């Protein structure tokens, strides 16, 4: 009697074990921006065909990433290839981006200072539907000694980085705002929430102001929704692209 009861229980255990194994062979990836209940925030955007690209109505497009070698086609491994501008998605600018003499001298993303790219950072809210002018910069009351500032603008509210078509009306720094920052603050890293930290209509001039001294690093296209205003530990690690004036970057905030 005991053996007849045990046998069905044994079969049930085997079936349950096999079912668990089958489920384990079909895992689902977990994608998230917030870790440990808000202790870590991933403020980098995902690279997808729909992410906006500079002056493009089609985003990055489906061809920016392709599977060059496929196991389904007989290859021993899956190998992807990527082709895109170094100023796509969340990225940094190096001095050579708008200064040709700096480009020739080798001021590329490999030369950027990791001590600037990593450390305490202040996240501030910019008055909505405004570009960052000298007046706006003064109104933010950023204290001397603050070296890294992330500027959240109406770009985040409008979710511009989630819209495929490039939007030239994005909020950004005007030239006078950039000059005010250089002359009146100790900021060495600026972060913004669209493809350029500089407003579209004054982009070249504003970039030249910020990059002229080779001591301020712009980080662009940050994902700043869902993060409270305040001070964090910022960690940005650009690809070490020798000879490139920009590089895709993974950035996180730690509370």
From Swiss-Prot:
GO BP annotations listed: defense response; L-tryptophan catabolic process to kynurenine; negative regulation of programmed cell death
Top-rank lineage group of the source organism: Eukaryota
Observed phenotype of the null mutant: No visible phenotype under normal growth conditions, but leaves of mutant plants exhibit a severely increased cell death when exposed to fumonisin B1 or a bacterial pathogen that triggers the defensive hypersensitive cell death. The double mutants cyclase1 and cyclase2 are embryonic lethal.
Single annotated GO MF: arylformamidase activity
Record-linked SUPFAM superfamilies: Putative cyclase
Subcellular location: Secreted, Extracellular space, Extracellular matrix
N-terminal signal peptide: 1-24
TM spans (from-to): none
InterPro entries on file: KFase/CYL (IPR007325), KFase_sf (IPR037175)
Classification via Gene3D superfamilies: Putative cyclase
Assigned keywords, A-Z: Extracellular matrix, Plant defense, Secreted, Signal
Protein name according to UniProt: Cyclase-like protein 1
């Amino acid at each position: 009697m005991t053996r007849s009861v045990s046998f069905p229980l044994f079969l049930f255990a085997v079936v349950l074990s096999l079912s668990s194994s089958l489920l384990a062979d079909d895992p689902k990836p977990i994608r998230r921006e917030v870790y440990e209940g808000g202790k870590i925030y991933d403020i980098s955007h995902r690279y997808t065909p729909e992410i906006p690209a500079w002056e493009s109505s089609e985003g990055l497009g489906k061809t920016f990433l392709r599977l060059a070698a496929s196991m389904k086609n007989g290859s021993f491994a899956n190998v992807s290839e990527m082709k895109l501008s170094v100023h796509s998605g969340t990225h940094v600018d190096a001095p050579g981006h708008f200064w040709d003499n700096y480009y020739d001298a080798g001021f590329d993303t490999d030369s950027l200072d990791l001590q600037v790219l990593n450390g305490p950072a202040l996240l501030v809210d910019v008055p909505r539907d405004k570009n960052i002018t000298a007046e706006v910069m003064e109104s933010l009351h950023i204290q001397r000694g603050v070296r890294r500032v992330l500027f959240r603008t109406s770009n985040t509210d409008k979710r511009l980085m989630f819209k495929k078509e490039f939007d030239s009306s994005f909020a950004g720094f005007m030239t006078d705002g950039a000059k005010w920052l250089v002359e009146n603050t100790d900021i060495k890293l600026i972060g913004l929430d669209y493809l350029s930290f500089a407003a579209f209509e004054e982009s070249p001039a504003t970039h030249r102001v910020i990059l002229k001294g080779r001591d301020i690093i712009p980080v662009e296209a940050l994902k700043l929704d869902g993060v409270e205003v305040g001070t964090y530990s910022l960690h940005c690690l650009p690809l070490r692209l020798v000879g490139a004036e920009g590089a895709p970057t993974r950035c996180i905030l730690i509370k």
